Swiss-Prot record:
CDD domains: ASKHA_NBD_HSP70_HSPA9. The gene is dnaK. Keywords: ATP-binding, Chaperone, Nucleotide-binding, Phosphoprotein, Stress response. This is Chaperone protein DnaK. The keyword Glycoprotein does not apply.
């Protein structure tokens, strides 16, 4: 079994790590950074990933996709999707299956596809470091992700060419990294406020056993919401001062978003910052500039309710685990937003203790995923991870009631069966509708999927015995079966969201990703060939100017002809032709090299004579000194 990488697929940034010896290590990307922006852009037929995509976002907002994790596994009519539509500059569209997809460069992409592009970048980063192919990964998700979101993340891994050995909850991964090779027994809370999601998990750690007691959270609360508050504040201030509404200008919005994110980060260490955006817009009187002094106090006032929203899940998680705040011995902060002093203050106030700051909030999740990868390929031993399902699972029964089969915070993997019956006389088929959530009526919960069990022997209502079994695997993904006890007829399914990608769609996306990888490779070869050719043209022209008079007219003509031929194809897209002309010029340029060598040889005797004279003078000088 080869190396298993751990990937933190984040809303704002992503990170990849691997076990190196007995320690997990974060791998730097090609730009030398330890995290990569979770941003994809499409520009001039090219796909950009990470920092290169982020750099051009201001000039290409409609084709730059960010924070797609907030859409993954969601239906287009989901209220959270509607909320996002009013914020992001790119188009969110309804897919044929009812899911929320994105549109860029006149193409539609599923959130799983966009996530796959980011995962491919993580995969390449690891392969460049390890010098070997990587095919297996552990990928993290927010603990409060439902089944549809987990399945969509697993699909993203498959599209990226990865076998996803395990989907692991982010707070659990952080706890693994925190408690790795520590022997002390502790009850800890992991408070994870990232770019787009919030989770809190309560765990007990003892002798290498990491047992999650409870988890809670909000999959639509994070740094993006904080940025939006600042952005809206800037729009309001500018409108008040200039009478111009910047919210209708996509280019201005993108600049404002970047400025909001930058100001938020700066105010974690400073108490005031200046936001200066020259030429943000223009009217009949000329260009307009945005200059605003923004303080930490103003920021805290803007986002106070968002921070407060994280406290109720903490309270519920403690209650479900059967603990009081005073029982928690350590609070681990995870996610970039936990650098904000006001967030740290709120955590300290609720738990009654100073939070632990000994882990890097941006990297700890990827490190934990790498440790779990090490466990799965036997590199790491003596660790047992016991996670939980975040939401209750059940089916819809008579009257639209939600009947639970598995309660939230049940340790996984787990299996549970229950006997149900028919609602009508002579009913020969039943529809099993599977839901996930905490509300009492099925319609108020998340419909994960449905299937039919047919061929039930005709009988009065209430007589047939139908055994429904729920099986949740270690990834938190749900498998359901229904069996008629009398006939033995059985129907089994791995629940796929009512939307979700079909197997055929996933396979097509895998092929597209492979094709894109080939195209990317060809593009890279073309760029490298052009760079080499351009460099050769420059050096040849320079040396031809200096030593051209030393060449015979035939040799000089041959070099000039090869030089002109290469310059003529420099702008073409034909890699083979550019390489061919480069080789021709390289061969012709050897004559210049010979001329240079000859010129240098002719000057050497004079140089030697000068050197000998210097030695004689030096010797005479030393003799005089001795006298």
């Amino acid at each position: 079994m080869g190396k298993v990488i751990g990937i933190d697929l984040g809303t704002t940034n992503s990170c990849v790590a691997v076990m190196e010896g007995k320690e997990p290590k974060v791998i730097e990307n090609a730009e030398g950074e330890r995290t990569t922006p979770s941003i994809i852009a499409f520009a001039n037929g090219e796909k950009l990933v990470g920092q290169s995509a982020k750099r051009q976002a201001v000039t290409n907002p409609r084709n730059t996709i960010y924070a797609v994790k907030r859409l993954i596994g969601r239906n287009f009519i989901d209220p959270m999707v509607r909320k996002d539509q009013g914020i992001v500059p790119y188009n969110i569209v309804k897919a044929d299956n009812g899911d929320a997809w994105v549109e860029a460069d006149n193409n539609k992409y599923s959130p799983s596809q966009i996530s796959a592009f980011i995962l491919q970048k993580m995969k390449e980063t690891a392969e460049n470091y390890l010098g070997d192919k990587v095919t297996q990964a552990v990928i993290t998700v927010p603990a409060y992700f439902n089944d549809a979101q987990r399945q969509a993340t697993k699909d993203a891994g498959k599209i990226a060419g990865l076998e996803v050995l395990r989907i692991i909850n982010e707070p659990t991964a952080a706890a693994l990294a925190y408690g790795f090779e520590k022997s002390a027994s502790k009850t800890i809370a992991v408070y994870d406020l990232g770019g787009g999601t919030f989770d809190v998990s309560i765990l007990e750690i003892a002798d290498g056993v990491f047992e999650v007691k409870s988890t809670n959270g909000d999959t639509f609360l994070g740094g993006e919401d904080f940025d939006t508050r600042i952005l809206n504040h800037l729009i309001d201030v500018f409108k008040k001062e200039n009478g111009i509404d910047l919210s209708k200008d996509p280019l201005a919005l993108q600049r404002l978003k970047e400025a909001a994110e930058k100001a938020k980060k700066e105010l974690s260490s400073a108490v005031t910052t200046d936001i200066n955006l020259p030429y943000i817009t223009a009217d009949s009187s000329g260009p307009k500039h945005l200059n605003i002094k923004f303080t930490r106090a103003e920021l805290e006032k803007l986002v106070d309710d968002l921070i407060e929203k994280t406290i109720e899940p903490c309270r519920k998680a403690l209650q479900d685990a059967g603990f009081k705040a005073s029982d928690i011995q350590e609070v681990i902060l995870v996610g970039g937003m936990t650098r904000m002093p006001k967030v740290q203050e709120a955590v300290k106030k609720f738990f009654g203790r100073e939070p632990h700051k000994g882990v890097n909030p941006d990297e700890v999740v990827a490190l934990g995923a790498a440790i779990q990868g090490g466990v799965l390929n036997k590199e790491v031993t003596d660790i047992l991870l016991l996670d939980v399902t975040p939401l209750s699972l059940g089916i819809e029964t008579l009257g639209g009631v939600f009947t639970r089969l598995i309660d939230r915070n049940t340790t996984i993997p787990t299996k549970k069966s229950q006997i149900f019956s028919t609602a009508d006389d002579n009913q020969h088929a039943v529809t099993i509708r599977v839901f996930q959530g905490e509300r009492e009526m099925a319609k108020d919960n998340k419909l994960l999927g449905q299937f039919n069990l047919e061929g039930i022997p005709l009988a009065p209502r209430g007589l047939p015995q139908i055994e429904v079994t729920f099986d949740i695997d270690a990834n938190g993904i749900v498998h359901v079966s229904a069996k008629d006890k009398a006939s033995g007829k059985e129907q089994k399914v791995t629940i796929q969201a009512s939307g979700g990608l079909s197997d055929a769609e996933i396979e097509q996306m895998v092929k597209d990703a492979e094709q894109n990888a080939d195209e990317d490779k060809k593009r890279k070869e073309l760029i490298e060939a052009k760079n080499a050719a351009d460099s050769l043209v420059y050096s040849t022209e320079k040396t031809l100017t200096e030593y051209g008079d030393k060449l015979s007219s035939d040799d000089k003509g041959a070099v000039e002809e090869a030089l002109a031929a290469l310059k003529a194809v420099l702008e073409s897209e034909d890699t083979a032709l550019i390489k061919e002309k480069t080789e021709s010029l390289t061969a012709a340029s050897m004559k210049i090299g010979e001329a240079m060598h000859k010129a240098q040889s002719e000057s050497q005797p004079a140089a030697k004579s000068a050197t000998n004279d210097e030695k004689i003078v030096d010797a005479d000088f030393q003799d005089v000194e001795k006298k």
